[in-house]
Structures are given as C-alpha cells and as structure tokens.
Amino acid sequence: MTTLFDILNTLNNNNNNNNNYAGCKRQHSINKRVDIIPSMDVTLTNDKLIIETELTGVSKNDIDINIKDSILIIQGEKKKSIIKHQQQQQHQQQQQQQQQQQQQQQQQQQQQQQQQQQQQQQLENSNKENDEPSIEEFEEDVKSKSELNKTTLNTTENKDEDKTTQNISKKFISERSFGNFKRYLNLSEILYQLDLNSINTQFENGLLTITIKKKFDSSNTIKININ
C-alpha cells in the first residue's frame, strides 16, 4: 500500500528526471534561453495538492501555467520593466529639456538675425546717403557679431553638458538575475486523485500558489459492468 511519503518521493524523482529531460528538449523547441530556475515547494495533504513557486520581481501578466500530458508547466519571464521604465522617463525628460533649449536658442538666433537684417538695411540706406558708415553703426555691427559668437559658444557648451549628464549613471553592483524561467512537475503518479476542475491560483508578494483539490473517490480502479 502506497503512502503519502511514497507518492511525494516519486513526485520529486520524476520531477528531477523530467527537468533534466526538459532541459535538453527546450533547446530544440524553444528559442528563448532559460536563465532562472525558481524555487518550488510541493505539499500533498489529505484533501489537496499545494504547489508554491517563488517568482519575486515577476509580473502576473508574464506568467504562463498549463498542464500537458500529466505535466504541470510554469513558465514566464522576469523583465527589467521597472528599470527600463525609469530610464525611459529620464530619457524623455532629457529629450524634452534639450528640445526646449534648442527652441529657445533658435528663437534667440532668429531675433538676432532679424536685428542684423534691420541693421544692415539701415547701414545700406545710410551708405547710400553717405559713402562712409558712421562710428555708431560700426560699433553696433561689431556688437551684434560678438553676440552671435557668444550664442554659438553657449550652444556648443550646452550640448557638451548634455552629453556628460547622460552618461553619469553607473552600476556598481549587479547581482539580480533577469530572463526566462521554466519549471516542470510530473503529476502522472497522482493525477487520478486530483480534480483538475478545482484548480485555484494565487499570486501575492512574489509567491505563486497553485492549489488542486483531491477527488472524493480517488481510487484508480474503474468498475466495468458486463452487459
């Protein structure tokens, strides 16, 4: 007569063998590389089977659970979504600031160009009247050119500052693991005892809990009547 201890032992052995087999198989069937092997606890009580899997940092939308050929498969991906989102926000803010600075610089340049054009027209008009330009006009022309040179220098300095600020962030310690994961659990030894219609899943604080209730009549013998 088999006991709960025997069933759990066979579950554990079959699970290890199946994981080894699946590891070879998934290289051919799945292009994605498996980077993480999450920890799993399996508990068999008098009325249910409880499977607990640690999936810290994984989103609920990135977890896929199914049963195929008496094998429970838990797979998914642990993404760098939070870090990427923060980096994207920072990048967008930097781009917006750069665009605002460029727009301001363009407006300043347009205003200065308009002032130059007006000054040139005034100079041309004055030159028509007098062949030699006045001292005041000459000084204004020199001032406008010097202001233009200053603005171009400021724009190049701002661009250099933007490049330096973008490359400030550095990662000193990187110990977290990200990527795809996949776990197999062979249920062939106790599948006849389980009511698959009663499967309940719960995901809270990074712990995935799958509960499968047992059938009321869990005997593996089927009575066949003779007609």
Swiss-Prot record:
Signal peptide: none
Similarity section: Belongs to the small heat shock protein (HSP20) family.
UniProt protein name: Small heat shock protein hspG3
Gene3D superfamilies reported in the protein's UniProt record: 2.60.40.790
The sHSP domain, residue ranges: 31-227
InterPro entries associated with the record: A-crystallin/Hsp20_dom (IPR002068), HSP20-like_chaperone (IPR008978), HspG1-11-like (IPR051779)
Pfam family, one: HSP20
Superkingdom classification of source: Eukaryota
Segments of this protein annotated with the region Disordered: 119-164
Keywords from the named record: Stress response
